[in-house]
Amino acid sequence: MSMNDPISDMLTRIRNAQMVGKDSVRMPASKMKKRIADILKEEGYIESISESVDEANHTTLELTLKYYQNKPVIEEIKRISTPGRRTYVGKAEIPSVYQGLGIAILSTSKGVISSRRALELGVGGELLCTVY
């Protein structure tokens, strides 16, 4: 089965795993998903990331989820730009997620970066998702 939006699939897997209290979540890997996972780890939303290759030579990402007082650290993870409706923002239009408590993840000319890093670099790009 082909997947139309792998990033939405990744975010949904994380959301569903946290709703049922799973320790980790596995998903097919890609460079974009790996970079998004790296940003989530850098910002403290997930515990760790591991990559593995199975017998069929398919790469899999495993994210260890993070909880605080038995509640998921990620309260909301939301896809903004979709394949059918791309959303682009300039450097002045980068949103402040929950008054700066959350982050947005953008795909820019400098790579996939967090909204904080995009503001430092002064670049805009495609608004992939928001995390709070």
Swiss-Prot record:
Name this polypeptide is given: Small ribosomal subunit protein uS8
Keywords per UniProt: Ribonucleoprotein, Ribosomal protein, RNA-binding, rRNA-binding
Record function comment: One of the primary rRNA binding proteins, it binds directly to 16S rRNA central domain where it helps coordinate assembly of the platform of the 30S subunit.
Subunit comment: Part of the 30S ribosomal subunit. Contacts proteins S5 and S12.
Family under the similarity heading: Belongs to the universal ribosomal protein uS8 family.
Gene Ontology terms describing biological process: translation
GO (cellular component) term, any one: ribosome
Metal-binding among keywords: no
A Pfam family this chain is assigned to: Ribosomal_S8
GO molecular function: rRNA binding; structural constituent of ribosome
Organism, scientific name: Magnetococcus marinus (strain ATCC BAA-1437 / JCM 17883 / MC-1)
